[in-house]
């Protein structure tokens, strides 16, 4: 619960600093960036201080400064595949964003007013990211749960945690798909992120098209998060790494050859 409190404090502080830097101080986009950095830095500092004060075993000692080759190797072996999962996600977003731009181009030198394809994709992607965050959180929680129980050799709890995560993800995927489809009615979700003047029939058309294709596959996405994090927690990092590479290649090829 304590990490959640630090997250809440970070969000509230971010909102307060956004208002302070943008309205009275008139710092614009730079002010918004500073607000984000400062709020996250202060929350991280608070979390570190709390952890070191509350848990004596986490405090630094002189012997901790001595590098351990085996420990460094384990961090790299397990950390790179896990980090690549997030890199894969954001690289994929960049690739897909580049594939959307041609839909707004009239010719090689001019574009459609308002860039409706980019606007529609961008906003639908934000909604999708919010809904996908549920499955990402389940996967992350499962990773920690399985890792701890593997260390404690409580393999029956690993099986129960895996089964429960699958059942919960199935239920939540139906909820997310239903909610997402309801929000596509008249492009309702776009009004959460944009002013009325920035929304057009074309932006709604493009955004809804993205969601109509993506939403039905949330159940598959949920099992991807569960499967990857389970295998990662069992210290088998090669398979999540290879699946991430395959996913990135597939995403790239689809963006290159499928759009028309």
For each predicted feature, which ranges?
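Hydrophobic alpha-helical transmembrane segments in multi-pass membrane proteins
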Residues: 11, 44, 82-94, 98, ...
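Membrane-interface helix-loop junctions in multi-pass transport and translocation proteins
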Residues: 11-44, 114, 238, 248-260
């Amino acid at each position: 619960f304590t990490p959640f409190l630090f997250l809440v404090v970070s969000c509230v502080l971010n909102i307060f600093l956004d208002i302070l830097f943008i309205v009275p101080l008139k710092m614009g986009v730079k002010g918004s960036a500073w607000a984000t950095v400062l709020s996250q830095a202060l929350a991280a500092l608070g979390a570190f201080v709390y952890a070191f004060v509350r848990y004596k075993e986490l405090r630094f000692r002189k012997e901790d400064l001595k590098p351990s080759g085996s420990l460094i190797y384990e961090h790299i072996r397990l950390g790179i595949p896990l980090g690549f999962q997030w890199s894969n996600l954001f690289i994929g977003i960049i690739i897909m964003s580049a594939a959307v731009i041609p839909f707004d181009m009239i010719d090689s030198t001019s574009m459609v007013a308002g860039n409706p394809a980019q606007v529609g994709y961008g906003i639908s992607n934000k909604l999708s990211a919010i809904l996908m965050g549920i499955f990402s959180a389940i996967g992350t929680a499962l990773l920690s749960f399985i890792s701890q129980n593997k260390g404690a050799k409580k393999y029956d709890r690993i099986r129960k945690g895996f089964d429960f995560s699958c059942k919960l993800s199935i239920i939540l995927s139906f909820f997310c798909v239903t909610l997402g489809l309801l929000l596509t009615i008249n492009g309702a979700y776009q009004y959460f992120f944009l002013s009325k003047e920035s929304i057009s029939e074309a932006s709604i058309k493009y955004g809804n098209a993205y969601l109509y294709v993506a939403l039905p596959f949330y159940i598959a996405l949920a099992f991807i998060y569960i499967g990857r994090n389970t295998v990662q927690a069992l210290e088998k990092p090669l398979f999540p790494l290879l699946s991430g590479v395959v996913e990135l290649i597939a995403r790239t090829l689809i963006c290159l050859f499928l759009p028309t």
